[in-house]
Amino acid sequence: MIIDTTEVQAINSFSRLESSKEVYGLIWLFIPIFTPVSGITIGVLVIVWLEREISAGIQQRIGPEYAGPLGILQAIADGTKLLFKEDLLPSRGDIRLFSIGPSVVVISILLSHLVIPFGYRLVLADLSIGVSLWIAISSIAPIGLLMSGYASNNKYSFSGGLRAAAQSISYEIPLTLCVLSISLLSNSSSTVDIVEAQYKYGFWGWNLWRQPIGFLAFLISSLAECERLPFDLPEAEEELVAGYQTEYSGIKFGLFYLASYLNLLVSSLFVTVLYLGGWNLSIPYIAIPELFRINRIGGVFGTTISIFFTLAKAYLFLFIPITTRWTLPRMRMDQLLNLGWKFLLPIALGNLLLTTSSQLFSL
């Protein structure tokens, strides 16, 4: 039986086409996974570099300069060092909870990125309950901290875990009330709809100007949720050695380090989305309508511009928590709880009532 060479070539080309389709299919399968992970990783590296440089400037010293140009690879060097450190376990602690605790904290913060929009419909999960889902997910992280403190079988670690739980409960409620005010003002709990509601009026339509009291309450509450100075009571070195991190070393300690900066990144992105107009340009005093409608531009250019403005606003906002860390002293535990329950909670509740009243009267 004689087979025509053209038929053999056609069969070979068809098989090569099928194999190339499979390869491209695998590539497109991993792109949606690789892109957010790489973006989050780069975001954390930028935050670490910014904090080191800003703190060096405040303290009038030279920051990192040997790990890469301008020290931009210092965070990678620190992470690599922690990766090869010995992973010690407490002899009388609960090993399972001790190992699970850091993962619970990091995963809960990573899941918060699902509802953060970086552009027009450029969001992993455009849900109608976006901000409510973020509040629910962020409340899981203190459970991981409490697990870590309890499983360490150490009085300092356990005290740090209890402080983390008490601090989270104290500031989660004002934070939720501020988010509810924004949802009422925008008539939606979707993060995309909240940004859409702000772009209609340009720069002066940002919720920063429409909700100044809520913005201040949200700012203080988010700093407390991130456990940044002056709210780092769960890991106060002078009182608790290192708090719930005392018994941790190696990669598990690195996960807590990563979670701290991830939480700061999430908070700054949500401030951008909820109060700073999201991805919109919104330049004041420029009467060009197209500049206010940057969220309607499609294609690669529009996507790039949207991501750029979102990240630019977020990183500009980061100067506030980073500068606060190196300028304000740590509060006492009673002062922290009084600030949350006796000051922020009434202010956030009053702001919610004012927002509700204004919305009812505007009907």
From Swiss-Prot:
Subcellular location(s): the record lists: Plastid, Chloroplast thylakoid membrane
What are the GO MF terms of this UniProt record? Answer: oxidoreductase activity, acting on NAD(P)H, quinone or similar compound as acceptor; quinone binding
Catalytic reactions of this protein: a plastoquinone + NADH + (n+1) H(+)(in) = a plastoquinol + NAD(+) + n H(+)(out); a plastoquinone + NADPH + (n+1) H(+)(in) = a plastoquinol + NADP(+) + n H(+)(out)
Q: Give the PROSITE patterns listed for this entry.
A: COMPLEX1_ND1_1 (PS00667), COMPLEX1_ND1_2 (PS00668)
How this chain sits in the membrane, per its record, is:
Multi-pass membrane protein
GO BP, sorted A to Z? aerobic respiration; photosynthesis, light reaction
* CC annotations in GO: chloroplast thylakoid membrane
Q: Give the enzyme class.
A: translocase
Q: What is its EC number?
A: 7.1.1.-
Major location (coarse): plastid
Residue ranges annotated as transmembrane are 27-47, 98-118, 127-147, 248-268, 300-320, 336-356
Provide this UniProt record's keywords sorted from A to Z.
Answer: Chloroplast, Membrane, NAD, NADP, Plastid, Plastoquinone, Quinone, Thylakoid, Translocase, Transmembrane, Transmembrane helix
Q: What family does this chain come from, according to its entry? A: Belongs to the complex I subunit 1 family.
Q: Which HAMAP family would you find in this protein's record?
A: NDH1_NuoH
Stated role:
NDH shuttles electrons from NAD(P)H:plastoquinone, via FMN and iron-sulfur (Fe-S) centers, to quinones in the photosynthetic chain and possibly in a chloroplast respiratory chain. The immediate electron acceptor for the enzyme in this species is believed to be plastoquinone. Couples the redox reaction to proton translocation, and thus conserves the redox energy in a proton gradient.
PANTHER family the record matches:
NADH DEHYDROGENASE SUBUNIT 1 (PTHR11432), NADH-UBIQUINONE OXIDOREDUCTASE CHAIN 1 (PTHR11432:SF3)
Subunit details: NDH is composed of at least 16 different subunits, 5 of which are encoded in the nucleus.
What is the name attached to this protein's record?
Answer: NAD(P)H-quinone oxidoreductase subunit 1, chloroplastic
Which species is listed as the source? Amborella trichopoda
